[in-house]
A protein has these predicted regions:
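Short runs within selected transmembrane alpha-helices of multi-pass transporters and secretion channels
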Residues: 52, 121-140, 147-158, 180-196, ...
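Transmembrane helical elements of multi-pass membrane transporters/channels
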Residues: 1-19, 120, 154, 187-191, ...
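Hydrophobic alpha-helical transmembrane segments of integral membrane proteins
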Residues: 1, 13, 43, 47, ...
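Helix-terminus/linker motif at the lipid-water interface of multi-pass membrane proteins
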Residues: 10, 14-32, 101-108, 164-175, ...
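Generic alpha-helical transmembrane segments of integral inner-membrane proteins
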Residues: 6, 10, 14, 18, ...
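Small-residue-rich hydrophobic transmembrane alpha-helices
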Residues: 31-94, 128-142, 146-147, 259-323, ...
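Short alpha-helical transmembrane segments in multi-pass integral membrane proteins
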Residues: 1-2, 59-126, 172-229, 285-350, ...
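Hydrophobic side chains within alpha-helical segments
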Residues: 15-16, 22, 59, 138, ...
Length: 431
C-alpha cells in the first residue's frame, strides 16, 4: 500500500522541487524568497491538509467496518467544509499576507519577491483542498494506485507551466517567481480535473455513496471536525514553527536562507518516502481497529518503520557521499553549492530519528485519538522552538548547526509517540 502513496508524494514533492530548480536559475534572492514564501503558503495550506487527514481516518474506519455507503457522506461533507475554508483563507491572504510577511522578513528584495509569489499561489487553495479530499478517499479505501497516475499528470503540468511562465516562452512574458506560483496553481487545477474524471469513469460511485451530492449535514460536519480539528490545529502549528525557523535563518542573511532552502528541497525526497510509509501505517492502523484486529497493530507499525529505513537509508548514503551533485540540481551558483554541503550532511543524519518518529506519530492519529496526537506534538514543538530561538536567533550560529533542531524534534516525537502506543489506551477508543 505504501508504494503508490510514495510515488504520489514524491511526484507532489516535485512541484516544490521544480519551483526551486527554476528559481535557482533565476537568482539567489528568488531562491530564498521561494523558500520563505513557499513555507508561508504551506502553513496556511496545512489547515486544509489537516482536515483531509482527519477525513481519511474516518473513511478508513468506515471502510474497515464495511459501512461503505457512509464513505461518500464523509467525503462530500468534508468537501463542503474545505471549499468554504479555501474561500476564507484566500480572502484573508489577499488582505493580510503582505503585512504579515513585511513584519517578519528583513530583506526588502526577498520581501518583494515573496509577496509576488504569495499573491498568485493562494489561488491554488481551492484546487489543492478539493484534490486533498480525493486523496483521502483513495488512501482511506486502500485504492492508492490512482494517486500515482494523478501525480504524474500534476508534475508534468507543473514543469510545462513553469517553463513557459518563468522564462517567458510561447510568446508569453517572463514572470519569474510569479510564474512559478501561477504554474503550481494551474498544475493543481489539472490534478483536480484528473481526479474528477477518473473517479467518474473507474469507481463504483453508488457503492461508496458518491453518486449523489447530499445536503449539508451539520451533525456529520461536527462529527468530522471532532476528529479533524486537532489534526488541523496540529498541522497549522507544526508548519508555523517551520516557518519561524526559516524567518530566523533569513535574519542570518540571504545566502543562509538560500542554503536552508537547498537543504529543504534535497530533504524532500527522503522525507516523502518516510511520509508515504507513515500515511500507509495510519490508514492500516485505522482499518485494523475498525476490523477488530488491534492485536496486529504493533507488528504493522514495526514493519512500516523498517520498510521506511530500507527505502530511505540507501538514498541518504548517496546524498551524503555526493552532496554537490544533488545541490547542483537546484542551483548553479558555485559559492552556494560549496557552502550548502555541511548543512546537507546534518540534514541526512536527522533521519535516524525522523523515520520512526513520523511513522509512530501517524499511527497515533490512525487510532482516532487526534487530540492526543496534537498534544504530543505540541510538547515536542515547545522544546523545538526553545532550541531554535536560542541556537539560531540568539546565538546566530551557522545554518548547518541550525539544522540540528530537526534531530531534537525527531528524538522527542519518537519518545513521546512510542510511549503512547506502548501504553495501549487507544485500543478502547471509538470514532
Amino acid at each position: 500500500m505504501a508504494y503508490p502513496i510514495l510515488v504520489s508524494l514524491l511526484m507532489e514533492q516535485m512541484i516544490v522541487l521544480t519551483d526551486t530548480a527554476f528559481m535557482g536559475r533565476v537568482g539567489e534572492v528568488e531562491l530564498g524568497a521561494a523558500a520563505i514564501a513557499g513555507v508561508f503558503y504551506m502553513v496556511i495550506f496545512m489547515a486544509g491538509h489537516g482536515f483531509c487527514v482527519g477525513t481519511q481516518i474516518l473513511i478508513a474506519r468506515r471502510n474497515g467496518e464495511r459501512r461503505y455507503g457512509e464513505v461518500g457522506q464523509v467525503f462530500y461533507q468534508g468537501l463542503y467544509f474545505l471549499m468554504a475554508l479555501a474561500a476564507v483563507l484566500f480572502v484573508a491572504c489577499q488582505m493580510y499576507a503582505d503585512e504579515i510577511l513585511s513584519m517578519m522578513i528583513s530583506s526588502p528584495n526577498i520581501l518583494a519577491k515573496a509577496e509576488d509569489y504569495i499573491h498568485w499561489r493562494v489561488y491554488g487553495f481551492f484546487f489543492a483542498f478539493a484534490g486533498g479530499m480525493f486523496r483521502s478517499f483513495y488512501v482511506g479505501t486502500t485504492q492508492t494506485k490512482t494517486l500515482t497516475l494523478n501525480s504524474i499528470v500534476m508534475v508534468l503540468s507543473n514543469v510545462a507551466f513553469n517553463y513557459v511562465l518563468v522564462f517567458g516562452k510561447c510568446g508569453l512574458p517572463a514572470l519569474g517567481i510569479a510564474g512559478a506560483a501561477i504554474g503550481s496553481s494551474l498544475a493543481e487545477f489539472v490534478s483536480l480535473l484528473f481526479f474528477i474524471g477518473y473517479t467518474r469513469a473507474k469507481i463504483d460511485c453508488r457503492h461508496f455513496g458518491l453518486s449523489r451530492f447530499p445536503a449539508l449535514d451539520i451533525k456529520r460536519q461536527r462529527s468530522i471536525l471532532s476528529v479533524s480539528m486537532w489534526v488541523m490545529v496540529q498541522s497549522f502549528v507544526s508548519l508555523s514553527t517551520w516557518f519561524i525557523f526559516f524567518v530566523y535563518i533569513e535574519h542570518l542573511g540571504e545566502e543562509s536562507l538560500a542554503i536552508a532552502n537547498l537543504a529543504r528541497n534535497i530533504s524532500g525526497l527522503p522525507f516523502m518516502m518516510v511520509i508515504a510509509f507513515a500515511s500507509a501505517a495510519s490508514s492500516i492502523v485505522s482499518n485494523m481497529i475498525g476490523a477488530g484486529q488491534t492485536d496486529k497493530v504493533a507488528l504493522a507499525i514495526r514493519r512500516h518503520i523498517w520498510l521506511a529505513y530500507l527505502c530511505v537509508t540507501p538514498l541518504l548514503l548517496v546524498v551524503a557521499a555526493f552532496p554537490q551533485m544533488f545541490i547542483r540540481i537546484y542551483t548553479d551558483i558555485p559559492q552556494l553549492v560549496d557552502a550548502a554541503v555541511p548543512t546537507v550532511w546534518v540534514m541526512c543524519s536527522a533521519y535516524t530519528v525522523l523515520v520512526p518518529a513520523n511513522v509512530l506519530f501517524s499511527s497515533v492519529s490512525g487510532t482516532g485519538d487526534t487530540r492526543m496526537a496534537f498534544w504530543l506534538e505540541m510538547a515536542a514543538l515547545v522544546f523545538y522552538m526553545i532550541y531554535n530561538t536560542w541556537v539560531v536567533y540568539i546565538m546566530r550560529v551557522d545554518v548547518m548547526w541550525a539544522w540540528t533542531a530537526e534531530i531534537v524534534y525527531g528524538s522527542l516525537m519518537f519518545a513521546f509517540c512510542g510511549a503512547y502506543m506502548r501504553r495501549g489506551s487507544w485500543r478502547r477508543r471509538s470514532i
